[in-house]
Amino acid sequence: MAPGMSGRGGAALLCLSALLAHASGRSHPASPSPPGPQASPVLPVSYRLSHTRLAFFLREARPPSPAVANSSLQRSEPFVVFQTKELPVLNVSLGPFSTSQVVARELLQPSSTLDIPERLTVNWKVRAFIVRSHVPASQPVVQVLFYVAGRDWDDFGVTERLPCVRLHAFRDAREVKSSCRLSGGLATCLVRAELPLAWFGPPAPAAPPTARRKSPDGLEPEATGESQQAELYYTLHAPDASGGCGGSRRGAGPGVGARAESPTQHPLLRIGSISLFRPPPRRTLQEHRLDSNLMIRLPDRPLKPGEVLSILLYLAPNSSSPSSPSVEHFTLRVKAKKGVTLLGTKSRSGQWHVTSELLTGAKHSTATVDVAWAQSTPLPPREGQGPLEILQLDFEMENFTSQSVKRRIMWHIDYRGHGALPDLERAVTELTVIQRDVQAILPLAMDTEIINTAILTGRTVAIPVKVIAIEVNGLVLDISALVECESDNEDIIKVSSSCDYVFVSGKESRGSMNARVTFRYDVLNAPLEMTVWVPKLPLHIELSDARLSQVKGWRVPILPDRRSVRESEDEDEEEEERRQSASRGCTLQYQHATLQVFTQFHTTSSEGTDQVVTMLGPDWLVEVTDLVSDFMRVGDPRVAHMVDSSTLAGLEPGTTPFKVVSPLTEAVLGETLLTVTEEKVSITQLQAQVVASLALSLRPSPGSSHTILATTAAQQTLSFLKQEALLSLWLSYSDGTTAPLSLYSPRDYGLLVSSLDEHVATVTQDRAFPLVVAEAEGSGELLRAELTIAESCQKTKRKSVLATTPVGLRVHFGRDEEDPTYDYPGPSQPGPGGGEDEARGAGPPGSALPAPEAPGPGTASPVVPPTEDFLPLPTGFLQVPRGLTDLEIGMYALLGVFCLAILVFLINCIVFVLRYRHKRIPPEGQTSMDHSHHWVFLGNGQPLRVQGELSPPAGNPLETVPAFCHGDHHSSGSSQTSVQSQVHGRGDGSSGGSARDQAEDPASSPTSKRKRVKFTTFTTLPSEELAYDSVPAGEEDEEEEEDLGWGCPDVAGPTRPTAPPDLHNYMRRIKEIA
């Protein structure tokens, strides 16, 4: 999330040259329009969600409705939030602009049944488990466990504010209610409701006391006879003032048709149905036959550690038959295995004489019991009589560490006078000893769904699991560390070896609505069912332009990361060439394309069926570009390359596949073709729009209660003084495609923004991009944007312009009822031949001249490539006047000193020129003229002297040039007016002179050394009608020295224009000095 922006408030001018391509962090780039030519540009904002655990941006599979259509000033983006602990924050940014909005709770959970005040319950679901689906009349209690799925188990702060759950059991028109409150780290509670006996059917016939038969799930004996059905529902309600939920309540009584309470105000949510039955009467003891004469009886229930077990020995009926051995005297040998201790024996009847001997060993204990008939009469026949009780044996169950164990007791009978029974006929009694009397186990997952993004990222997605046990007395225990587990299909879902979480690793190939993992505890087992969503393959890859071409006239520097394989050169040589010539080391720019990857998460409805269920419905595509960004590949890196995770650029002509590969197996998850053509396109239009601020709004997406639609609108009007604005820039190509300027690196171009009316708005360069600053109210095409090639590729003294465009601007102080939208579709002005046009001036790159049609002076500010990220601006565009910083004060003071120095220099020059301009030349006949100043004197000779009237005073260090006669002189010898001229000596020996009078004369130096000199001498004119003339310095060529021409014919004579000797010598000396 972008931090809160500070500094100069308000909006700023967007140089999209430094926008989305350099945006930070896992911001979510705005999705481009569907592939193909775009009719108009789209506001290139970037969305980013924070404070979420699992969320996706979406796109409609069908064309968007007009309500969500995008334009150059509006951008809509749907998204969905699956998992979050707090309210998400949506940030939208455009260059330096950024605004955020908290997603309202009503948008995240529009119809949540689990409502907790001041608590976010997104994706929370109340799950209900029926402990026993068959309820016997002997235990007429229905038990239902409730827990909250989708909640973070580490979130302990909410446990004190969880609601109550009320169970409603209905049988015909009768109802029974019972409540409990969700609590604890797992947010669970167990509801127990006692059912009336009238709800159960008639009793079933009695069954013999045989060994207990268990149902397949090991929870309950199978019901026999006809069962009755009862329906279970639940409601949620807030606890009372004391924090309780109220006890169980029953209807008006058995058989009464009306309910005792008014219907609840909360919606009834169905749980399921249970079966009610009357089991046959069952004895509490189970019988085991030791042989045909003797039997034992023991309790029909599991045993607990430390419990004393009493086993009774009986003489079975029909035991005195002729085939049976005599039972009047026998010896019973008992061996108890480790974990069972034989405490003692005692006679249960005076008719039997019992003596015993006990031996306790390290591994087992044994007892030898001698039993004899105590009466003098023989044992009477037992036909038709019940069992005869003989003796009682007491055993103690020892402690153990496991949850349940099996203990064995071996029985051996030796009849006196008869051989022992074969070993195979020896009886063995097996006892079950348990730590707790568990009637059911239930696996609970923190969430009921898994979105298998591991297929795309290679990162495991895991869901924690807890297994709880429910005892007969209603106690709930955590037995997660004591269970065993196994996945029914590891191609869908897996489970950890410690059974503490289920996961997907990315190697799965399908999903399921009821993926099952089985957990086992002792003889009990229970399944955990999950919904697993997998991405639909192949992935859908969208390119904004699948055919990339070179752009005419757009030259960019050849950099190592862009250079084609065929053009690779030594980097040092390239840098040297770039310094030598701006046209070398550059190549034509290739078009760029944005890319996005979409998919749909789906699953199968049930095992063995092909019915496909799509998450969020078939109308939505989920964007997964960020998830697969590390696994994108360009098939041929010589043809194209990836600028970043969302941009492709061409390198050389060819066709290459662009694909997304699996992070685990390198299999191709999605693929599309990219073509780089040899054809060239030109920039037909540069489109620019002013963006003064951004407005973000959130609302439910039409037709879907789960998705949210974010809409960003750009405001164009600058509404207060010194407000800053930015530009949104788009390029239109001759092939019909458009692209934001932000797709291209700022080092590949230059952007010049000029203000055509500085009274209304100015352009400044405070940051890494130009900003438009409001100065006064006004509207119209007050700005001008000019796109040029990179400075390193500019030709000498030329500026190659790619495109120009006027930009509409409106400054109105005060808030309008609605912000008018300006659209300036007028074509830009690209240079001929793809924009390689020279600018209207010879200034260096980066300077700008006002457009000829501009109504006032224009200023320009070139865009330089930014070297750092955008500086922060205030979130929400709260703009306030700012004071000058210390740095700015120092810079302004330094600028003022420079301006003052320049002003003083100019005033001095003007005074100097005006002072000597009005001096007059002395009258004719004066023998000397004093030159009051000489700008330059360089030479090795002595001051020159010229004979006659042309000689200067002795005090002058440099002689003056001879005066020419005026152009309208008379042959009668009227007085000639001398003018002092400017003599400009140049390094090549040439000099500029008057258009009418130019002459050359050789000059000789009176010294042995020669130097060339530039000097200028000013003097005054005798009248305002006279103009300055130039006296040229002679060439070194001897032939030219002999052909000097003069403007006064009476000086050289009527026949041949030759120079007087004195003047000839004078000119030669000047030549030598020059």
UniProtKB/Swiss-Prot annotation:
Please state what the protein is called: Transmembrane protein 132E
- Disorder: TMEM132E is located in a region involved in a heterozygous deletion of approximately 4.7 Mb; this deletion, involving the NF1 gene and contiguous genes lying in its flanking regions, is observed in a patient with 17q11.2 microdeletion syndrome, a syndrome characterized by variable facial dysmorphism, intellectual disability, developmental delay, and an excessive number of neurofibromas. Deafness, autosomal recessive, 99: A form of non-syndromic deafness characterized by prelingual, bilateral, severe-to-profound sensorineural hearing loss. Sensorineural deafness results from damage to the neural receptors of the inner ear, the nerve pathways to the brain, or the area of the brain that receives sound information.
Q: Which residues lie on this side of the membrane: Extracellular?
A: 26-893
Task: Report the transmembrane regions from the record.
Answer: 894-914
Q: Which residues are glycosylated?
A: 70, 91, 318, 399
Family as reported in the entry's similarity comment: Belongs to the TMEM132 family.
Query: Which residues lie in Low complexity bias regions?
Result: 841-862, 972-984
- The segments labelled Disordered in the record are 202-226, 241-264, 563-585, 814-867, 946-1063
- Compositional bias (Acidic residues) spans? 1034-1044
Q: Which domain of life is it from?
A: Eukaryota
User: Which spans does this entry mark as compositional bias, Gly residues?
Assistant: 243-256
